Each structure stands twice: as structure tokens, then as C-alpha cells.
Amino acid sequence: ANAVMNGKNWNSTVLFYSYDETGGLADHVVPPLPPKDAKGEWMTDPYDKKKGKVPTGPGFRVPFYAISPWTRNGGVFTEHAAHESQIMFLEEWSKAVGKGFHTKEINPWRRAQFSNLVNMLDFSYHDGSVLKLDEVPEASKDPITDQYNGADVCALKFRSDVQPTVPYNNTEAQSLRVEKGYKPVRGNLTEGHYLTFEKDGKALQHKGHKLSLTNACNDHDGKDMRFVLWWQGKNPKDNAFYISTADKHDR
């Protein structure tokens, strides 16, 4: 990130950080399933053919974030996305610069239902200033072979504590715990969040079974201000939701 922000093309750059593992027990939000007739989305279970056709995905959520002059005011991107979304973003970018391409390996259902990530960027707000990030020490290398040896150095330093046993001191009771916090949302809405609706310092509340406006709170977590979306569609981009108060969700 330091190299990109200090580079000559920073003002026209987006840097994606993508992961393929969660590092946790599980995701508390069930991913959408494709319809049975979606081409390329179902296969015969290779380990137990008696189970018949099983979906190849989409899977649980994994960390993914972007750094860009057009993402500087922060937020949580809430659209359904998969690794193919990054390829579709490149397709959109290539079309914009007059060198369009089309990836035939992305099947029609995923192309139609998953985000191309364009809504992750806010083109109405641009901040090209450079943040000073913490310095990261250079990765350890073996002085003789010049090969990276971080794992060996870590094992030598911490001895038997370097490889904790699965599930890394987590318990099943903790598996659905979510870190408390708040951020504005970007993109089309999806399930899996408490939502507050605010504007100009005011928030929508449902106190006493009536909707009204009240002063927003600093942490945006007032119990009477939280709402929950329930997906009612058949495909991710149906954008059909039932909205309820959070107390209906907590029972």
C-alpha cells in the first residue's frame, strides 16, 4: 500500500486485497444457493455419489478490501461478490479504457448475480492524499540460502507455542460472535447486518411500536434505531427484502 500510494499513478489506482480463507470457525450468514438449472453450479458429490448433485458454491465470506482515492471515506461493501467479481471489475475497467475483454469461464448465473465491484468506489468523492502507514519490518531471510525463513524463526522464538491446536482457543459458543462496531454501507444491501437510517444528525427509531425521528447516537447502536433485512428473493440480485425491527431478530 505504501508503494502504491507513493507511486505516480496513485490518483488513478485501486488496490484490492483478497483472501481465500477466513481464519475463523464459520460464517454466520448463509450464502445464496444457485438454482438447480444454473449451468456450471452443480456437480455430483465426488465423495458420496448417493447425495446426488451438490452446489459448487458460493462459499462462506472471506476478507476483502480495497484501497483507492475513491474509497477513502470508508464503509462496508455489502453486495454479493465472489472471486470472479475481481475479474468482472477488470472487464469493466478494460471497457472504459477502450480495450474490453470477456472472460468465458465465468458462467452466466454468477455473471448476472454477483457484483462487478464498481459500486465499491464512490466516484463523487476523491481524496488522493497519502496516508502514513506503520513501517513493516523486512521479512526474515536465511543469511546463507537467502530464502525466507520466517516460520523457522518463529518456531525457534516461541518454541512449543507456535502452533496452537485447532480451534485456536475458540469455542462453539463463541462462533457466532461478531465484533461490535459501525460503518456506512456501500452498494446494494444484503442480509447479515444491523442497519440504522440516519441523515443530518437524525435517526429513524421504532420506539413504542411507532416510527419517528430522534437524535442519532455516536455509536449508531441504539436498540430502538436498529433494523434488520430478511431476504425474500430467489436470486442474490432480486433485492427483495422484508425489513423488521432488530428486537424481532434478537428473540
Q: What spans do the regions from the language model cover?
A:
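Lectin-like carbohydrate-binding module/patch detector with strong preference for beta-trefoil
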Residues: 160, 164-251
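Substrate-binding rim/cap in mid-to-C-terminal beta-strand-loop elements of soluble/periplasmic
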Residues: 36-93
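Metal-dependent active-site segment of extracytoplasmic phospho-/sulfohydrolases and closely related
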Residues: 2-42
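C-terminal "exit" segments of structured domains
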Residues: 107-192
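Loop/turn elements at helix/coil->beta-strand transitions in domains of secreted/extracellular proteins
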Residues: 8-15, 22, 60-62, 70-71, ...
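A structural signal for well-ordered alpha-helical segments within the folded catalytic domains
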Residues: 80-88, 92, 111-115, 198-202, ...
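Active-site rim elements
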Residues: 1, 5, 48-54, 70-81, ...
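Sec-exported extracytoplasmic/periplasmic mature domains
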Residues: 2-9, 91-98, 122
